[in-house]
């Protein structure tokens, strides 16, 4: 097997692993709970598809490029977590709300 075929197989295994980490939601719950689970699942699925596309289309590092640079570029590929909303309003907004 050539190195190109091995690299393609490695990328496909990685993409397959990504797909396995996000199973379709099932289980009990109210209609709203099931709907929210499906919505979150679709959002994660879209992120996985985008990540898989980037992995598949990521160019092979040139021979003269250091391996560390290629690793750093691959480490930037990640599924983003949605941030939690802030517990309180920032100071400038509090001041504006208090003085009409």
Curated annotation (Swiss-Prot):
GO terms for biological process: mRNA transport. It is found in: Host nucleus, Host nucleolus; Host cytoplasm. A motif (Nuclear export signal) lies at residues 67-79. Gene3D superfamilies: 6.10.140.630. A motif (Nuclear localization signal and RNA-binding (RRE)) lies at residues 30-46. InterPro entries: REV_protein. Its main location: host cell. The keyword Translocase does not apply. Residues 18-39, 80-100 are annotated as: Disordered. One of its GO terms (molecular function) is RNA binding. Coiled coil: none annotated. Escorts unspliced or incompletely spliced viral pre-mRNAs (late transcripts) out of the nucleus of infected cells. These pre-mRNAs carry a recognition sequence called Rev responsive element (RRE) located in the env gene, that is not present in fully spliced viral mRNAs (early transcripts). This function is essential since most viral proteins are translated from unspliced or partially spliced pre-mRNAs which cannot exit the nucleus by the pathway used by fully processed cellular mRNAs. The RNA-binding motif binds to the RRE, a stem-and-loop structure present in incompletely spliced viral pre-mRNAs. This region also contains the NLS which mediates nuclear localization. These overlapping functions prevent Rev bound to RRE from undesirable return to the nucleus. When Rev binds the RRE, the NLS becomes masked while the NES remains accessible. Homomultimer; when bound to the RRE. Multimeric assembly is essential for activity. This is Protein Rev. The lineage of its organism: Viruses, Riboviria, Pararnavirae, Artverviricota, Revtraviricetes. The gene is rev.
